[in-house]
Amino acid sequence: MSKNLVVIESPNKVKTLQKYLPNDFEIVSTIGHIREMVHKNFGFNEADYSPVWEDWTKSKKKFSSLSFKGNLKGKKLLSKYDIIKSIKEKASKATNIYLATDPDREGEAISWHVYDVLDEKDKSKCQRITFNEITKNAVLDALKNPREIDQSWVQSQFARQILDRMIGFRLSRLLNNYLSAKSAGRVQSVALRFLEEREQEIRSFVPRFWWTLDVLLNPKAEGVREACANRSIPIVLREINPALRAGLKFEEEKSVSGIDFLDEASAKKFGEQLKGVFEVYNIDETKHYSSSPNSAYTTASLQKDAINKLGWSSKKVTLIAQHLYEGVSINGEQTALISYPRTDSTRLSAQFQQSCKEYILNHYGEKYLSNRIVSAKGKKGEKIIQDAHEAIHPTDINITPEMVKNAIKKDEFLLYRLIWIRTVASLMADCKKSHTHIRFINDGNKFYASSKSLVFDGYRKIYEHFENKESNDLYIDLDKIRVGDRFMAKDIKITARQTHPAARYTQASLIEALEKSNIGRPSTYNTMASVNLDRGYASLNKHAFHVTQLGEQVNEELSKHFGKIINKEFTKNMEKSLDEIAENKKNYQEFLRDFWSNFKEEVKLAEGSIQRVKKEKEFVGRDCPSCASPLLYRYTKRGNEKFVGCSNFPNCKYNEFSQNKPNLTLEKLEELCPECNSQLVKRRTKFNPNKTFVGCSNFPRCRYIKKDNAS
């Protein structure tokens, strides 16, 4: 019999964690949440706004006991009943019970649920422990410093769940009845509003057109020493001679760049007047400036970088980061490579900073060391850092990306390298640069060139070292130029320019925008960007969000009737209230009571005024071959594919896209998708039915294809 029982969430952690625990410790996994709120009455008691939990003894629905990775073959299917029963049996035999679920509010709530279902005699054995990384020191230190379950954190999680039910269930029912839309939600609907506002901004944008004139000087000029590194010198028009302005249409944009011609003819006319030499009449005083490295990753900044640099989806970033945290196989041994990946903190512990600085000192020298101390504050100290986590960082800075490159999967390596480099760079010295303006004159017309030099590479050194690429900055060294040097024009270039609307949101930029508005939490960033795709409210085209017609209708009605709730400020304040509940500054039941009483009235008003959208039937002009009823055009549930169906549906289920499209799925496999945990299937290719491949059954939501398997 094991004297000590450790309860965790994910079975993926078991092997990694077992390495650091004595033999008399047994680990059991909850495999996520063990209880959910009932669906009746939105899952809470309206008398006191406490959650009502389902009866776990009746929870018999089976699911895989498997983790996110691996093969289904030979694995037992479990229900929540099976899991809770097993935990209770093991708890009754243990001397000590350590509740070691994830170190956030959701993990705190799961620990409370485990505690709540235990027999009274076993509850006294329970202690709560947390660790931000699965390393020997972190785990053993947690065991030495157990605590009680934080009821404020638990209540904050209860409030979030009930709040999401209140808003999501009522609004979803309303949308489904009047718009045939799938759902609405506290955060997803605000994200949709972001997308729609950007869509309207793009549609209403009126571009401004202008022309610029740039001159390229020949570096091989008389009196110029060593030909200025033998490169042509680009100069920008800054001021036009008053005597030459007649007939020219232009604007002076001195605060930006220089002269903007309002038509091409004016630019050409001026260009034809440029004759003779361009002489240096002044060199401005050199300005020195520095650029500091970015802080170590938060969940949001990791999402943004991985989506942009690796081309991944938000869901994939979340999944691979979880693998690295829970432990990956390195030479047959499970090793956790990064700290907890759901955090909005940029803090690094003093101990970790010291080990990282020792690495920098040993590999790059003292001049590359930063003297900054990374504090627990967020960006500019504006944001409350949830639960005082650390930033995402490697568990051991001495495990470099190159050391594990051939031992772990490619995707795991790519994300680990991103995290490792960013962490080390955050503690390196600033990059130092210099900037000088060189002034030229030609027939009273004034131009300037910018001389940029890299003085000290600082933190950029590590990016060049590990990513094998230089900075994107273009450095032009014109130090050899002196006042009085004379040049001839090599080329005069006239360029048509125009302003452009703001770019459509990508998954990365939407997460960044929501995070800057203090909307959502690290655990929800993954779904915030994707849920509107799943509901058919938006589509992705070349990685950019486009709002569908259904999405526009949903946003319009929500903004019209629930504008006080579905907006940035309300959602931001709601997150703040949840933080205050977690800090024991606000009572969660009073908070919910105040919200619910007002929200119910708004729903009643909306039900009396919202317009039911009637979709005009679009008939094909021929009858159904199965039942002779008229055929009409329909749309799939997600609203993104048109097909021909019978008007007598559901009595007649004839449709033509299933008639015209062959069944591409051949068989389901006993293997899970490594990206979304759905079952893999064997399929025929679309254009060659004789060729097969293995892909995800969750297509098109997940587009994973197993490589090297086509036949």
UniProtKB/Swiss-Prot annotation:
Binding-site residues, Mg(2+): E9, D102
Keywords of the record: DNA-binding, Isomerase, Magnesium, Metal-binding, Repeat, Topoisomerase, Zinc, Zinc-finger
Zinc finger (C4-type): 624-652, 673-702
Domain of life of the native organism: Bacteria
Active site as annotated: Y340 (o-(5'-phospho-dna)-tyrosine intermediate)
Catalytic activity: ATP-independent breakage of single-stranded DNA, followed by passage and rejoining
Signal peptide feature range: none
Originating organism: Mycoplasma pneumoniae (strain ATCC 29342 / M129 / Subtype 1)
Entry EC number(s): 5.6.2.1
GO molecular function terms attached to this record: DNA binding; DNA topoisomerase type I (single strand cut, ATP-independent) activity; zinc ion binding
Record's keyword annotation contains DNA-binding: yes
Cofactor(s) named in the record: Mg(2+)
GO cellular component term, pick one: chromosome
Sequence segments annotated as region (Interaction with DNA): 183-188
Membership in a protein family: Belongs to the type IA topoisomerase family.
Complex formation: Monomer.
CDD domains in the cross-refs: TOP1Ac, TOPRIM_TopoIA_TopoI
UniProt name for this protein: DNA topoisomerase 1
Gene: topA
Residue ranges occupied by any Toprim domain in the UniProt entry: 3-134
Upper classification of the organism: Bacteria, Bacillati, Mycoplasmatota, Mycoplasmoidales, Mycoplasmoidaceae
Marked site (Interaction with DNA) residue numbers: H33, R160, D164, R342, R535
GO BP, one annotated term: DNA topological change
SS bond list: none
Matches recorded under Pfam families: Topoisom_bac, Toprim, Zn_ribbon_Top1
InterPro entries on file: Topo_IA, Topo_IA_2, Topo_IA_AS, Topo_IA_cen, Topo_IA_cen_sub1, Topo_IA_cen_sub2, Topo_IA_cen_sub3, Topo_IA_core_domain
Record domain Topo IA-type catalytic: where: 150-604
General function of this protein: Releases the supercoiling and torsional tension of DNA, which is introduced during the DNA replication and transcription, by transiently cleaving and rejoining one strand of the DNA duplex. Introduces a single-strand break via transesterification at a target site in duplex DNA. The scissile phosphodiester is attacked by the catalytic tyrosine of the enzyme, resulting in the formation of a DNA-(5'-phosphotyrosyl)-enzyme intermediate and the expulsion of a 3'-OH DNA strand. The free DNA strand then undergoes passage around the unbroken strand, thus removing DNA supercoils.
Keyword check for Metal-binding: yes
